[in-house]
Amino acid sequence: MGSGKSTAGKRLAAHCGYAFVDMDKLFETKHNCSIESYFEQFGEDSFRKEEALLLRETASLENTVIATGGGTPCFYDNMDWMLPHGICVYIEMPPKALYNRLINSKSERPLLQTHCNASLLEKIQNLLSQREQYYQKANITISGLDVEIEKLSMLICQNIYEK
């Protein structure tokens, strides 16, 4: 949810010589529609079920960096499934920093688009509060605050090789 997972993931994959998969893009390709459209047509529950199935389809991939959606770890035991299948990285960001990143792209994010700017920060705080218990299970936690993407991807790479 705006922490830079996809951008950092692409850089990380390049540094490691790995392939890169963005789960949101994979979902949109498989379902031939945007996540926003899917939410509108089928709702969040259906989206989360399909997302969990798609995540499990990535099990056969090797040497691949996978950027999940922000909610992916929080449903259908996805985080517990991801942990033995790879190294999970949580890019930690404070709510206000996420707000500043998301304020101009909230229309592309189904869980945020109905919120006016005044209530957006509160929604982000609530989502983080609900999701934190899952994010904290990650193998690696790195602050994404005030760090250039190139530096962030290098920090993640260093942490992975230390594991």
Residue ranges and their predicted role:
Residues 3:
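ATP-binding Walker
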Residues 6:
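Walker A/P-loop
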Residues 14-25:
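Post-Walker A helix-loop "phosphate-sensing" segment adjacent to the P-loop in P-loop NTPases
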Residues 15, 129-163:
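NTP-dependent small-molecule kinase module
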Residues 23-83, 108:
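ATP-dependent small-molecule kinase phosphotransfer cores
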Residues 70-72, 94-96, 147:
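Short glycine-rich anion-binding loops that position phosphate/pyrophosphate groups of nucleotides
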Residues 85-130:
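A glycine- and Lys/Arg-enriched "phosphate-lid" helix/loop adjacent to the NTP-binding pocket
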